[in-house]
Amino acid sequence: NEGHMKVEGETAYCVDINTGFKNGYKTRHDASASMSAAQIEDVALSLEYVKQYRDSHSNLNANQGYLLEQCVVWQRLSEQLGWKCDNVRAAYSEISQDIQNEVYAGARVFVQTNKGRYKCGGYIYTGEGQDLGQFWAELNVGNAKVKKTTANESITKANAMYSIAGATFGIFADQ
């Protein structure tokens, strides 16, 4: 009923499915004060998947995209917090069952295959009415100097085909 929620111009989501919406002032807290890093990463990566899906599927309008995002937030929080509504969905008249099945299954796979590849965070806004949340996932990037060595110089020495020029590397480590 409340539509597309925003805090200071940025999209926000209901993070308390059992409380009604009220306009008003809220206080912002870092999500890590009430959620584990794994929970934040789960929600943030799920949202990242839905945003990427939405951006690549022009058949979804902005309201449908936001509704899918809100549903995935509720699904992930329900599983984490024991709300017993893990399969919350939009009405099929709003978004088809096939699209919802694809998005929700895709989000789960995306989370599993991308854990640790993104820096994730969030804020929780508390006050009158339901709590709101904002979550983000930023792809970890950086620079590295690559040194190529070989155990078999007879194959690699003066071999123009043996090159790493133009290669793309993904390097991940704990901070």
Q: Model-predicted segments: where are they?
A:
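Solvent-exposed loop/turn and edge beta-strand elements of beta-rich ligand-binding domains
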Residues: 41-56, 64, 131-175
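Short, surface-exposed polybasic-aromatic patches that bind anionic ligands, especially phosphate groups
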Residues: 1-136
